């Protein structure tokens, strides 16, 4: 249940009828954001200290995305992710900018944004 709450799926699980509810073949009854949060909950349930994620919040609305990042931060789980979303970058403790596989800049998004905001969607 901790993983479900951390992934901001509690209400969705309750509305579906619980953790054992059928969601259809490959989750066809779920929205894109629900599929993303379900995948995150599954990863969190493994009790890993670190997660590697590719655009973990790309299908989420802004409010849910902020709740998700706040929840992940509170969980103490280290998340290393790839994203071009400014909202996700703003939630990061540290942002690394790569160009052609080379490290070209790093730091908090608040300091990097003036130079790199054109890359964030």
Name every feature range the model reports, one short phrase each.
Residues 85, 90-121:
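C-terminal portion of ABC ATPase nucleotide-binding domains
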Residues 1-22, 49, 119-121:
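Conserved "ABC signature" C-loop
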């Amino acid at each position: 249940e901790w993983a479900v709450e951390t992934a901001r799926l509690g209400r969705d699980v309750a509305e579906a009828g619980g953790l054992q509810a059928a969601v259809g073949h490959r989750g066809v009854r779920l929205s894109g954001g629900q599929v993303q949060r379900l995948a995150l909950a599954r990863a969190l349930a493994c009790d890993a200290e670190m997660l590697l994620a590719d655009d973990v919040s790309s299908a989420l609305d802004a409010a849910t995305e902020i709740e998700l990042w706040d929840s992940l931060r509170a969980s103490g789980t280290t998340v290393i992710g790839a994203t071009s979303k400014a909202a996700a970058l703003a939630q990061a403790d540290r942002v690394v900018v790569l160009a052609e596989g080379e490290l070209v800049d790093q730091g908090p998004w608040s300091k990097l944004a003036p130079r790199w905001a054109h890359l964030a969607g």
